[in-house]
Amino acid sequence: MSAPLIDKYRKMATFDWKKLKAAVEGEEHVRLKSEVVAKMKSEPVFHRDYRVLSREEQREVVHQRWKKIVEWGLFKDPYSDLENFHALTETLEAYDQGTSARLFLHGNVFGAAVKSMGTDRHKDLIQKTENNEIVGAFCLTEVGHGSNTAEIQTTATFDNGELVFNTPSVSAIKCWAGNLAHSATHVVVYAQLHVEGKNEGFHGFVIQVRCPRTFQTLPGITIGDMGSKPGCWQGVENGWMEFKNHRAPLSALLNKGCDITPDGKYVTSFKSASEKQSVSLGTLSVGRLGIIAKGMMACTFASTIAIRYSVARRQFGPVKGAENEIPVLEYPLQQYRLFPYLSAAICIRIFQKKFVGHFTEYMMRVIMGEKSDELSEFSKEVHALSSGAKPVATWLGVESLGEARKACGGHGYLQMSRLNTLRDDNDPSQTFEGENFMILQQTSNILLGKAQSIGSIETPMSTMSFLNQKPSKFSSWSSNPVNDVLSAYRYLTYHLLQTTSAEAYRLKASGKNSFEVRNEIQIHRAVNLSVAYTEHTMIHWVQQFLKEIEDQSVKPVLQKVLNLFSLFLLERHLATLYITGYASGGKFGEDLREKLRLAVAELKPEAIALVDSIAPDDFILHSALGASDGKAYEHIMEEFRKYTNEQPRWVCDLAQFLQKRSQGSKL
Amino acid sequence: MSAPLIDKYRKMATFDWKKLKAAVEGEEHVRLKSEVVAKMKSEPVFHRDYRVLSREEQREVVHQRWKKIVEWGLFKDPYSDLENFHALTETLEAYDQGTSARLFLHGNVFGAAVKSMGTDRHKDLIQKTENNEIVGAFCLTEVGHGSNTAEIQTTATFDNGELVFNTPSVSAIKCWAGNLAHSATHVVVYAQLHVEGKNEGFHGFVIQVRCPRTFQTLPGITIGDMGSKPGCWQGVENGWMEFKNHRAPLSALLNKGCDITPDGKYVTSFKSASEKQSVSLGTLSVGRLGIIAKGMMACTFASTIAIRYSVARRQFGPVKGAENEIPVLEYPLQQYRLFPYLSAAICIRIFQKKFVGHFTEYMMRVIMGEKSDELSEFSKEVHALSSGAKPVATWLGVESLGEARKACGGHGYLQMSRLNTLRDDNDPSQTFEGENFMILQQTSNILLGKAQSIGSIETPMSTMSFLNQKPSKFSSWSSNPVNDVLSAYRYLTYHLLQTTSAEAYRLKASGKNSFEVRNEIQIHRAVNLSVAYTEHTMIHWVQQFLKEIEDQSVKPVLQKVLNLFSLFLLERHLATLYITGYASGGKFGEDLREKLRLAVAELKPEAIALVDSIAPDDFILHSALGASDGKAYEHIMEEFRKYTNEQPRWVCDLAQFLQKRSQGSKL
Ligand SMILES: Cc1cc2nc3c(=O)[nH]c(=O)nc-3n(C[C@H](O)[C@H](O)[C@H](O)COP(=O)(O)OP(=O)(O)OC[C@H]3O[C@@H](n4cnc5c(N)ncnc54)[C@H](O)[C@@H]3O)c2cc1C
Ligand SMILES: Cc1cc2nc3c(=O)[nH]c(=O)nc-3n(C[C@H](O)[C@H](O)[C@H](O)COP(=O)(O)OP(=O)(O)OC[C@H]3O[C@@H](n4cnc5c(N)ncnc54)[C@H](O)[C@@H]3O)c2cc1C
């Protein structure tokens, strides 16, 4: 076993991984990313080992790294320099989500909120934000309210030309705001605006919270940290904040579409509270696209680490003798457990990139001031799809890391595998920017709203058009599994829409109110509807990408990847396919599963090269089990040797204790 | 919201939770556990907060706690004082698996191995082990071998009346041995025994590795730590060990059934290498029953924390206004996500307790020296069931903690919820004492071995008897969901056995060797077979327990619990039920899912009282979200307030940096 086995596996592939990478990610993106990586490698502050840092240490390194990135001046505005922005973002997200959260929350959450809700009077602040002269945080969540943002309880009361902020109860204390506990000088904060004794509802404000020199909090503001957190979020200073008659100037009100006149009258151009709220929170939906990428990245890490390790790891063989043991990657079961996430890493990337393209077009039209029915349809569709894709991608991502850990056996549990930490890092992606089950309701609500217009559904991204045709049941398999899968998804989505909608009617007719109805149709119906619609779109978009791909040399392997991805997803709906009547008889399911097993097996010779095409640089990957040289044992032992012959101070106490026990027993 | 809502939910229950607890756990067990808890509460060394300790700190507290427990003299031998042993074990496991590992690895793994493989010449060592004059570790795993223990490469060579230990390669370095890195004075170590130039195969040895006074390693031995690990295992000093001509006396050989004569001849009474190996590793299967309990405990923690929090957490409501918001436990979807694990916590406990009963009977017969065909059938059946139940229970356990975290929204991600840490704590239970997918193969191998004797299968625990009758397809639902579920499982298991066995034949006939055949029948077939067999037994045993229960007042609620557990498990096989032909047509699946939703809903009024009946004492639970007083927000804020106005030292640097940015922009 002198030359690592991984080289043998590299040679099995039918394609050139660099070409595949270029085809999927774009050459420029690949080049820009490697520039960022080179920059990071050359800076000692980005170097790291496998020790677990304390809360204090972790935050200090995040601070140092953040400073470096700001100094580099690389972190550009997404709209002025899209390519650089994506390259930097992706690299940082892969390197450490804590560090990237530090930058994002300031620029893309705090900054974007001020920009989108503010007016000319906030220009100076926006300037300072872009120039990193201040540090921003985003304070929406309260101890008692996260998902139900409309009911947050912090108050901002107009008084004598100023705004007075208060926290009326424990559950109104702001919390979870990243950057807040130690660094923020300014925050965007949401509160109920009271003017002349009337609650004008949910509004966004921007206020200063600390003196930028002493970092003391301003009068009437108490800020604290939330204590320990898992994974990389230990390095993020999520804070809580309590107001007691904190006075801020009137300019704190982010006054696009509403204002308070100098003589203290509230005026607004919003037609309804919900219109105002949707503008106030509009910036949040942008974030969802970024979170889809977190899911993709999780699948990327999981499959890279576990598949490379599965080549180095040999266990059992056809005949006795350690020399006859085979790499665990050879076991069909091991492949079945890992390859679907490899295919997901690639397909979600392709899907997400296309989605970002659509979204950018949408945003451009919004920024240009377009007001049209089509644009509002566009907004709805973006909302439906992002609210479906964020849960699907993040659930897959977290699941993939759990499975990868198990597939690496005991060594997967070492800190240096990084798999448990990565799982903890990604865990909250299922919750923030919209709790997954909550936003799936948004997708199904929009779809259910279309149930009446079947036959004439038209949307800008055409993700719902297939619902116009009554789909037919399964008749036979074609030679193209992806087409077969898409047909099944169309039937599934259509039928789930029909049955969920019918169930809602039935419940309404039985006297339930719309709140009860919505709650009662979720399980097995609305939830599955949202997921089926989303997965259909994902698969369909990747299929389109494949049709348009220029480099024909990588098309066959991508086809294999998509075959697996689509069969893997569909198999999870097999029971529902039977229930909705798409097929009957055992053979359909048996066939589907056989096709799935086949699709898994077909990826085996390509697996290591596919991993090479998605894996981040070793420096970013930072996993003893997943390094590209395939020398897992060497890396493991290198780390082990650092802890040779350790004698913690309590061993003395142990020696005395054993001594005492032994004397005791002789009495 | 002055009186916590939890009290209202407590009153909804139809039963007395204390009676339920006594019925399920036994009064004596409940009493003994509360004695242990009281003892722990009174000792400051067992107090803890929510900070994450460093590797060094965590190990030091484990050492201190271990000392206290040894001083109490509570940790008795399982066979001489079963009740006390179980009460202590369960309490410690719930308190911190790291601390309990410290005790277990010494007494129940190291000690048990010496006892079972050793002879009279090891009596003194056993005495010292029981008296805690030495510290033991168990060294089986090597860097290159875990699952395939037969191929471990460490050698023990007979030379001049002594045994010489060597580590021939990097992959032969012992690793993962708990207690080894700092504390162990002695270890049981497995190696290939070479006598007169011949490899006599895999043997167990017990050797001293450190001086008990200086704790220096003995000549020819290098020991180190494995660095950082996740969760409570950070507190466990899993170590690695390398031999270079380490000489030990001949008495190191654990010589039950084999020996080396004074003149250097190897003698053995074992008939085959596999017989020897199964005796050498026999002690391991005992452990599996303990690991099933880890899965149960994980479900217990997950459902306790998430269900109690779901009552305190109110979000959304039928009409606007924070005062109209309802506890998230009211949402059918939230119930659907959590109640199955509550039912699993209770049912797995009942199953595991019964299994321990059977196992104890089995061990008694072994210890009495019985040698019979029936006993060897017993051994096989215990092996099949424990190899199935350990995966089923630990997968459910880890899954439950992940779902519970998500169900607690953002606050679930705080360290003080304990959910992520508990997930990390439980994660390796899926891997150690037999990697889950590996041992499922043992279950299916045993079942497949029975395929030929259908009609006359008889085993001591009768878990396979149902296979003797050809089961019939679904005809209609009865009034008892558990009976319906069991019928479905019988059909499922029977058919999976038939089809898996047929597939194996087909592959063999096509020229594949038995290694290939075994690998190729796993996915969708052998794996599902093992799981179905195990789940059938679990449900069946709980049903039997219910039939025999004395306290009739708790029977109805336990019936609800079992209804849910069995429907929940079966629903996961719905697609396979269709494939195997148990049912056809959408209605069957729709009905099954409706029954499942109903079973979930029926548990709602009982949920909090059920949680009370399984929840460990608050001191042990140690979760701000899950405390029995239902005051989650108060506990969260109490912790938050500890971190008020923190100013880490780097904030100075940040202030200067912002200052510089601002000056720069003005130039
Ligand atoms: C690491 C991290 C960073 C964060 N950063 C920020 C930040 O910078 N700024 C900020 O303002 N916030 C931040 N948050 C907060 C985050 O946005 C919220 O936690 C998130 O929106 C989820 O809301 P919640 O916690 O209220 O969940 P909850 O709504 O309390 O969810 C709890 C459970 O109830 C269920 N549930 C709730 N309502 C319903 C319903 N109607 N039907 C069915 N089920 C329901 C949910 O599905 C979930 O299972 C952060 C959170 C985390 C974990
Ligand atoms: C926290 C912890 C504590 C431990 N404590 C101890 C201890 O005290 N003493 C000790 O000796 N050991 C200990 N161990 C080691 C543990 O026993 C092994 O890790 C465990 O047996 C799994 O073996 P492995 O790591 O070799 O997994 P591997 O066998 O390497 O498994 C890797 C992957 O390969 C797959 N695979 C392997 N063979 C096959 C096959 N034939 N077919 C299909 N798939 C296959 C597995 O399913 C898995 O997905 C500990 C481990 C941990 C994590």
Curated annotation (Swiss-Prot), chains A, B:
Keyword Zinc assigned: no
Tissue specificity statement from the Swiss-Prot or TrEMBL entry: Expressed in intestine.
InterPro entries hit by this protein: ACO (IPR034171), ACOX_C_alpha1 (IPR055060), Acyl-CoA_Oxase/DH_mid-dom_sf (IPR046373), Acyl-CoA_oxidase (IPR012258), Acyl-CoA_oxidase_C (IPR002655), AcylCo_DH-like_C (IPR036250), AcylCoA_DH/oxidase_NM_dom_sf (IPR009100)
Principal location listed in the UniProt entry: other
EC number: 1.3.3.-
Signal peptide (UniProt feature, chain positions): none
Gene that encodes it: acox-3
Sequence motif: Microbody targeting signal, positions: 665-667
Activity regulation, per record: In contrast to other acyl-coenzyme A oxidases which bind to and are activated by ATP, does not bind ATP.
CDD domains per UniProt: AXO
Species annotation: Caenorhabditis elegans
Binding locations of FAD: F138, C139, L140, T141, G146, S147, G178, R313, Q334, Q335, Y336, R337, G410, E435
Keywords: FAD, Fatty acid metabolism, Flavoprotein, Lipid metabolism, Oxidoreductase, Peroxisome
Family annotation (SUPFAM superfamilies): Acyl-CoA dehydrogenase C-terminal domain-like (SSF47203), Acyl-CoA dehydrogenase NM domain-like (SSF56645)
Function: Involved in the first step of peroxisomal beta-oxidation by catalyzing the desaturation of fatty acid-derived side chains of ascaroside pheromones, which regulates development and behavior. Specifically, shortens indol-3-carbonyl(IC)-ascarosides with 7-carbon (IC-asc-C7) or 9-carbon (IC-asc-C9) side chains and contributes to the shortening of ascarosides with 13-carbon (asc-C13) and 15-carbon (asc-C15) side chains.
Intracellular or extracellular location(s): Peroxisome
Any single biological process term in GO: fatty acid beta-oxidation using acyl-CoA oxidase
Entry keyword Lipid metabolism: yes
Protein name per the record: Acyl-coenzyme A oxidase acox-3
Molecular function (Gene Ontology), one example: FAD binding
Pathway: Lipid metabolism; peroxisomal fatty acid beta-oxidation
Cofactors required: FAD
GO CC terms in record: peroxisome
Quaternary structure and interacting proteins, as annotated: Homodimer.
